[in-house]
């Protein structure tokens, strides 16, 4: 009987705790608050490592949301030309740079839905680097074409408040919002 109680107690502890560890959570501080992001290391290990390495180095702090399309997505992560704290900052070139370390695609079965974080890339499927986007809504036409590496678990209203770009300019943003700070919990 005590073995059954022990099993029940352990089961309760496992299921009542968070389903992710703190190491799997990235905090994204924006002007309107903090966004918590759960990473999918099991689905996109190389991409999660690249992102977390850049976060740990502070590479994303000050990086602008250079392309934001209402109802679709907010794109950021150009650590080369999009970092407003850097001497290389150039809003006209934001979206064309990265860290210089392209990653092989890790397309997976995670859907592009509201709150999904996925890697931006060029035409080459293996050209993802540091840029990523957050989906404002469901975007199934991206499934299997971009690497999903995380999802917003708290603070989606903060993401919704990111300054939107001009639709005529494909979402390019004048005087864009930026990442104030990113850190791993």
Model segments located where?
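Cyclophilin-like peptidyl-prolyl cis-trans isomerases
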Residues: 18-185
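Bacterial N-terminal signal peptides
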Residues: 5-15
């Amino acid at each position: 009987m005590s073995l059954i109680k022990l099993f029940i107690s352990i089961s309760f502890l496992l299921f009542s705790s968070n389903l992710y560890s703190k190491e799997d959570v990235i905090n994204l501080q924006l002007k309107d608050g903090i966004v918590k992001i759960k990473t999918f290391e099991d689905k996109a290990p190389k991409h999660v490592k690249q992102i977390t390495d850049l976060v740990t180095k502070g590479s994303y702090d000050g990086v602008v949301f250079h392309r934001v399309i209402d109802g679709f997505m907010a794109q950021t992560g150009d650590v080369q030309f999009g970092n407003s704290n850097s001497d290389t900052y150039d809003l006209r070139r934001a979206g064309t740079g990265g860290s210089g370390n392209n990653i092989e695609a890790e397309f997976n079965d995670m859907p592009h839905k509201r709150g999904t974080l996925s890697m931006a890339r060029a035409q080459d499927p293996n050209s993802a680097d540091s840029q990523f986007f957050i989906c404002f809504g469901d975007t199934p036409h991206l499934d299997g074409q971009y690497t999903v590496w995380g999802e917003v678990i708290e603070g989606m209203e903060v993401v919704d408040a990111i300054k939107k770009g001009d639709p005529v300019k494909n979402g390019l943003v004048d005087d864009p919002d930026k990442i104030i700070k990113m850190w791993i919990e």
